[in-house]
Amino acid sequence: MATEYALRMGDGKRIFLTKDKIIEELEAGMANASDLGEIPDLSGDEIDKLAEILMMPGKAVSVEQGMEVPVTHDIGTLRLDGDQGNSGVGIPSSRLVGCMMHERAFGADTMELGHIDYSYKPVKPVVANECQAMEVCQQNMIIPLFYGAMPNMGLYYTPDGPFENPGDLMKAFKIQEAWDSMEHAAAHLTRDTVWVMQKLFASGADGVNFDTTAAAGDADMYGTLHAIEALRKEFPDMYIEAGMAGECVLGMHGNLQYDGVTLAGLWPHQQAPLIAKAGANVFGPVCNTNTSKTSPWNLARAVNFMKAAVQASSIPCHVDMGMGVGGIPMLETPPIDAVTRASKAMVEIAGVDGIOIGVGDPLGMPISHIMASGMTGMRAAGDLVARMQFSKNMKIKEAKEYVAKKLNVETMDLADEYVMRELREELDIGVITSVPGAAKGIAAKMNIEKLLDVKINSCNLFRKQTR
């Protein structure tokens, strides 16, 4: 009797498959991506490698040593203090505590601050509060700290916003009116996002994370691209990450273009050049999980799409890997076996430059991803590599080589806690444990500026405030 391996369905349910069935599912998932995106198939060796990863006996697996990548985040501290019946675990804690827990306890390479409503439009009335929270976090933290939220263009339609819902207009065959409504909403999205980030950047934010770009279709992406363009023009040194909502841009409008390219119907490898053109530093491509398909089918499909996106992108790609995307099951408590296998496959086969950790409970998301493929932040040198990706648009190999040269170590040492623990204390660039007298917060970041030859926004703010 053939050996069966414990795997998952796209909804997280455990199933058992033989090796032959795993290969069959991998090839079918890959073929689906190839057909839809008109991209090359994975090679036979890559399919075999995927099967090998899926059949590994351990519950948790990880990348080969030396292949670790930085992680970025969606939803910020909401996975800790959120309590809405989804993936938040409802721990009463401040956002400062939540951010520092990710930095000090989880070994995150970067982190983000976000509002409980997690969209840019609701931030407007409370932006002063967000600015104060950002300032306090930046004074205490060392890893790059973004402000993150969703463009969420749906909030600009009735009953939540000023413009009539284009879905209702289209049902009434008022097509021109629907187009006008989407275009007006996109303009407001651009305006509001830029305004919010002007305030947050003035309060020391390292940058901005656009989470779930194009959730409301091509007009949502249109508004976001123009927001990125405006922010890049005004703030040349702002870190900008643009993550997508889905694998294909829905053509709700159908006629909108950016840089002469129609946005409707774009797949990840076609989205990447436009995100870079607008001025983002890092692109977060997405592949949606099909809950009625197996994990091999979903993972091969996701890896194939992401490999094509990485090859088409001139900027680093941090693949979105929350629940329901990137080959990960759609479950609030994502199974650790599925998460770590998907994380390893994305790094070793798709060649991604980083992982954007998305929705899911703390153990199933940040802890699992960081254990599987992360650089462990300040425990080693993950925060430094991430800074170079965002400061200079460096892909993972170049960023690691740059940092290793500055530290006078080998690239493999960048994720070695033993090497980096002593080196970080010697250079006074911040250590993860509480050492009396060691540089912390702004002081440590000022030393990082000198080491890496970069400018850090919170340090610039501090310098302006001193007399």
Curated annotation (Swiss-Prot):
Pathway(s) per entry: One-carbon metabolism; methanogenesis from dimethylamine
Listed name of the protein: Dimethylamine methyltransferase MtbB3
UniProt family annotation: Belongs to the dimethylamine methyltransferase family.
GO BP term, example: methylation
Molecular function terms from GO: dimethylamine methyltransferase activity
Catalytic activity: Co(I)-[dimethylamine-specific corrinoid protein] + dimethylamine + H(+) = methyl-Co(III)-[dimethylamine-specific corrinoid protein] + methylamine
EC number, as in UniProt: 2.1.1.249
Lineage of producing organism: Archaea, Methanobacteriati, Methanobacteriota, Stenosarchaea group, Methanomicrobia
UniProt source species: Methanosarcina mazei (strain ATCC BAA-159 / DSM 3647 / Goe1 / Go1 / JCM 11833 / OCM 88)
InterPro entries hit by this protein: Dimeth_MeTrfase_MtbB
Keywords assigned by UniProt, alphabetized: Methanogenesis, Methyltransferase, Pyrrolysine, Transferase
Biological role: Catalyzes the transfer of a methyl group from dimethylamine to the corrinoid cofactor of MtbC.
